[in-house]
Regions:
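His/Asp/Glu-enriched, well-ordered alpha-helical/loop segment
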Residues: 26-36, 43-66, 71, 77-80, ...
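Active-site-adjacent helix-turn-beta-strand microarchitecture at beta-sheet edges
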Residues: 1-32, 79
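Ligand-binding beta-strand-loop-alpha-helix segment within the catalytic cores
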Residues: 88
Length: 170
């Protein structure tokens, strides 16, 4: 992982202890329910995916046993493992669309363009879904899915900034 732009040691924070994650995995396995974890950034996503990767699907139907919410800047290895094990990723391209200034300030242009590698995830077989993240999105109508879809299809922010054309979806 790399730190936020202009820092040497700021990577984000973990809000879930290892013991809490283990208890969530144990509960979901016992009750055959889907584990849903929130993870943004390479380290957080790798931590969740690596832990879940050690398990076999415990669901009694074809529902993915793990859903990782808020996928932003996943490592290549996490994408591969998620595809291999049938994990489900949820991501919000609306953020690069609606909050482009923050992405450019904190990540820079090159990193921003790779934050939401949706084309790569789909091409590698990851089960993927977009969401608006309403009401947290700072857009005029947070629950409107169309700006999110527009961002995924055009890979342009509201102001026209290129957000990584190689990751467009159709």
């Amino acid at each position: 992982d790399k730190p936020y732009l202009g820092t040497t040691d700021e990577y984000g924070i973990s809000t879930c202890s290892d013991s809490l994650m283990e208890s969530a995995v144990a509960f979901c396995k016992k009750h055959h329910c889907q584990l849903s974890m929130h993870a943004m950034g390479g380290s957080a996503i790798s931590r969740v995916v690596d832990r879940a990767y050690r398990e076999e699907n415990w669901m009694e139907d074809d529902t993915p046993y793990v859903r990782v919410e808020h996928i932003t800047a996943p490592a290549t290895d996490s994408i591969r493992k998620a595809a291999e094990k049938g994990m489900f990723f949820v991501t919000q391209p609306i953020f690069m669309y609606a909050e482009i200034e923050s992405y450019l300030t904190n990540l820079g242009e090159a990193w921003m363009k790779t934050c939401y590698p949706v084309r790569t995830m789909l091409d590698q077989g990851v089960q993927l879904c977009f969401s608006t993240d309403a009401p947290a999105t700072s857009w005029a109508v947070p629950s409107d899915p169309f700006p999110c879809l527009k961002a995924a299809v055009t890979r342009r922010a509201y102001d026209g900034t290129d957000c990584g054309q190689d990751q467009r979806v159709d």
